[in-house]
Amino acid sequence: MGFYQDRIVPHLVNLSMRNSRLAPYRERIASQGEGRVLEIGVGAGANLPLYTDRATEVLGVEPHPRLLNMAASKIGHVPTKLIEGSAESIPLDESSVDTVVTTWTLCTIPDIAKALTEMRRVLKPGGQLLFVEHGLSPDQGVRKWQDRLNPVWKKIAGGCNLNRPITDLIEAAGFRVSRLEKGYMQGPKPLTFMYEGTARRM
């Protein structure tokens, strides 16, 4: 990784993920984590203190070692293991977790289809994928701006994409979306169309 990706992006990620407007989304998602929980893209660990006693163990996978170092100080009361690795090749056995959590992660993973296939592989039958992500807006005017801005945004924001159709991608990987809430969060519309929901392994 270059200097910008290696040194600057981790701090930008940490700062952006501490936005107070994201906190209610995080709390809703983390509080639903049950059993053995796998968090994809644990980042600097913002979700770690939010898991409840419904979770018996949290496994946090993150490709960036600097972010993992930041996450270590955020571990809450639930037993937690931090793992350096990628979502496209999750270092866990098949059908080994009860819950997968992603919060503002699917926008950035390079091979999103492969990553979602991996998430499905490690989930137990009937296991749940809990997600909150920003992505493609249903409004044509906003979509045009997302498409225009995406090439530049992706470069400055560590690979983040503004225009991924989140639920379509999840369902294409073999999940059934059982709960979904969509809408704009406060802020520039190309950046703030949110998808929050639950999907089950089919």
PLM regions: where:
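A short SAM/SAH-binding and catalytic strip from SAM-dependent methyltransferases
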Residues: 99-111
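Short alpha-helix
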Residues: 158-174
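A short glycine-rich, Lys/Arg-flanked "PGG" loop and its adjoining helix->strand segment in the class I
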Residues: 113-125
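A short acidic, Gly/Pro-enriched loop at the edge of an enzyme's catalytic core
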Residues: 88-100
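Core SAM-dependent methyltransferase catalytic element
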Residues: 175, 182-202
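Class I SAM-dependent methyltransferase SAM/SAH-binding core
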Residues: 38, 44-89
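Conserved beta-strand signature within the Rossmann-like core of class I S-adenosyl-L-methionine
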Residues: 126-134
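Conserved alpha-helix/loop element of class I SAM-dependent methyltransferases that forms part
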Residues: 16-36, 46-47
